């Protein structure tokens, strides 16, 4: 039972991690003009707001990698903690099995 709970917890954290990276660049492509004449350049009219994580809009490229790096820092500790607990749980289960067999 404990194993199942741990697996569910790991899945939840993984989903959180993936969704966090996924939502960053949604606003990026909404500003391009649907203009068929390539010589006319449309100005962007102040539609871009500040970036949620960095406070400014400057880091456009490599954004996903940066947010992923940050998230590995943030969730890496939790993941290692869970893996440690998982291995301890496995050890306990194995020891109990040995005890019951003998």
Curated annotation (Swiss-Prot):
Region Disordered, annotated ranges: 24-55
Instruction: Tell me which UniProt keywords the record has, alphabetically.
Output: Transposable element
Give start-end positions of Basic residues composition bias: 24-51
Q: Which domain of life is it from?
A: Eukaryota
Q: Extra info from the record?
A: This protein is coded by the transposable maize controlling element 'Activator' (Ac), which is able to activate chromosome breakage at a specific location.
> Would you tell me the protein name for this molecule?
Transposable element activator uncharacterized 12 kDa protein
User: From what organism does this protein derive?
Assistant: Zea mays (Maize)
The organism's taxonomy opens as: Eukaryota, Viridiplantae, Streptophyta, Embryophyta, Tracheophyta
């Amino acid at each position: 039972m404990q194993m199942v709970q741990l697996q569910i917890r790991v899945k939840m954290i993984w989903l959180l991690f993936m969704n966090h990276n996924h939502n960053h660049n949604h606003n990026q492509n909404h500003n391009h003009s649907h203009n068929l004449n390539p010589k006319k350049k449309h100005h962007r009219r102040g539609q871009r707001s500040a970036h949620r994580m960095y406070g400014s809009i400057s880091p456009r490229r490599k954004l996903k990698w940066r947010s992923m790096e940050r998230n590995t820092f943030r969730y890496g500790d939790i993941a290692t903690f869970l893996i440690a607990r998982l291995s301890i749980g496995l050890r306990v289960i194995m020891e109990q099995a040995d005890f019951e067999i003998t």
